[in-house]
């Protein structure tokens, strides 16, 4: 998707910093996604898009994946996440979310869910 990535220096710097200090769940999820393990789909980590940084993104499939830690539990954060997901969907990126707990405890189920999301047709 040409022109989708956000090249503002602030976001690029933030994304680089996030790549150097991933959470345990992000490390585990990256192990599932890297090197085209899911039917050859290529994912990137900490991708600046539309004013946000998406934890993992497959641009060709229009799919973003978020690893949500405990900070995503309160109502205010849930509303922000919903608005963020809607803004990214408007740019052609569907967001799916997994809790850090699920990523660490049920990686096979997470991998299956990602595979199903990749198989779905992206919204128009």
Regions found by a protein language model. Give the residues of each.
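Basic, amphipathic alpha-helical patches used to engage nucleic acids or provide basic targeting signals
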Residues: 12-23, 45-121
């Amino acid at each position: 998707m040409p022109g989708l990535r956000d090249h503002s220096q602030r976001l690029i710097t933030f994304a680089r910093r996030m790549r150097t200090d991933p959470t345990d769940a992000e490390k585990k999820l990256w192990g599932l996604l890297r090197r085209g393990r899911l039917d050859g789909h290529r994912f990137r980590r900490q991708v600046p898009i539309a004013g946000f940084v998406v934890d993992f993104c497959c641009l060709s499939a229009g799919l973003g994946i978020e690893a949500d830690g405990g900070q995503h539990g309160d109502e205010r954060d849930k509303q922000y996440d919903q608005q963020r997901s809607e803004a990214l969907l408007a740019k052609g990126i569907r967001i799916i979310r997994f809790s850090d707990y699920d990523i660490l405890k049920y990686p096979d189920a997470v991998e299956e869910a990602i595979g199903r999301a990749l198989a779905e047709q992206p919204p128009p």
